[in-house]
Amino acid sequence: VLDYSSLYPSSMISENLSHDTYVMEEKYDNLPGYEYKDITHDVYEWINPLIKSKGKRKVGQKTCRFVQFPDGRKGIIPQILQKLLKARKSTRKKIIYSTVKYSEEGEEKEFSGMYEEKNGLAIIKTVEGEIVDFPLENLISKKDTYSEFQKEVLDGLQLAYKITANSLYGQIGARTSQIYLKDIAASTTATGRNLLHLAKDKTLERFDGAEIVYGDSVMPDTPLLLKNKVN
């Protein structure tokens, strides 16, 4: 199974999709020193506006242009998403934090963070980002930093960050939302769809005999299920 991490939020970040980066007036187009990203999405209309159950039909395509700032700065929405995804990532790490005690030159020391063992060494990346390593024989004790209750709280918090990040796309695509802008929502799904096709093409190119049996572009998960053919 191949799965993009936070596909729609990541799409909005990578293409800088935001209300303040969407070029809607000609005077903001082709400015010197700026680059632009064009995204083409499908346009649909109701088959029968009075009977919504009949569904929609594709009537064309529209190309939207988004500015890419020369200093690498992101638009408002991508900045918010970056903060949410970063917070989620750091929160998820805390769930598996360990607290270790070890001896060094007769002195007992204690650190908490991401723990691993490699080549006879105990290695821990502390909360502050410092890398500490010591011989495994100097290890006195190791325990989970957080209790089971605290882990459940942290898990709920990381899930809240994830849902909030995903819901920003939903709000932009909802007519009742104050931040509704259909072209941004459509450009997001178009980017996500392109990434799924890219993953499919690269997989088939890399793994001889692989077959795509399912692809899901519904949030929050976007897996590609693969089957390897047996000759």
Where do the model's predicted regions map?
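Conserved acidic
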Residues: 1-231
